[in-house]
Amino acid sequence: LINELNIEVDAYFTSQLERAINTLNIILKILHKSNVTINKAWELNERHYGELTGLNKDDTIKKYGEKQVQIWRRSFDTRPPPMDKQHPYRDKIKSNILSESLKDTIKRVIPYYEKKIKPLISAKKNILIAFHGNSCRALLMEIFNISKEKIVQFEIPTGNPLLIQFGDNLKVQ
């Protein structure tokens, strides 16, 4: 899409999680970009699923039930059970956060967007962000003024680009 539309990207952002970094590296390879600055930020990380981290969906449903898993995945302000100190992924998480709701995710994504990304958009720069479903939901909620009731219903397909064009005063075109 970037090549098709002949878009020159001015700044690249991603989370600190391996899958988003890998996605960005694939994009950079396709774009024949090898010497660019990549802004990696924990604030763009996927929502922290606490004790559910590392479990696949089927195993999680077997353990907690489909209804409860759906509540954790799609509610706005309900957190999954917190990550235990003995959890195998606990050492990989650099913050003291033990579990997050989408509401919590918004509280870290939006300030980062306001401070680091929005000024570049205001300066008419083209930005590419490789990140995750819930951090993307948080940003879309802000940009498009989407209600919390509607944002939890958004399905964001993995690996599909989303092009947002801004006009004057950062209005979405």
Where are these regions (language model features)?
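Short helix/loop segment immediately N-terminal to the Walker
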Residues: 84-86, 90, 120, 124-125
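Phosphate-coordination/substrate-recognition cap region in phosphate-metabolizing enzymes
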Residues: 2-85, 89, 141-165
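Surface-exposed cleft-lining segments at the edges of enzyme active sites
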Residues: 79, 90-106
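Active-site-adjacent alpha-helix immediately C-terminal to a catalytic or transition-state-stabilizing loop
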Residues: 21-22, 35, 103, 107-172
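Generic detection of long, well-ordered alpha-helical segments
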Residues: 14-17, 62, 99, 106-107, ...
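A generic short-segment signal for beta-strand/edge and adjacent turn/coil regions
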Residues: 9, 28-29, 96-98, 129-135
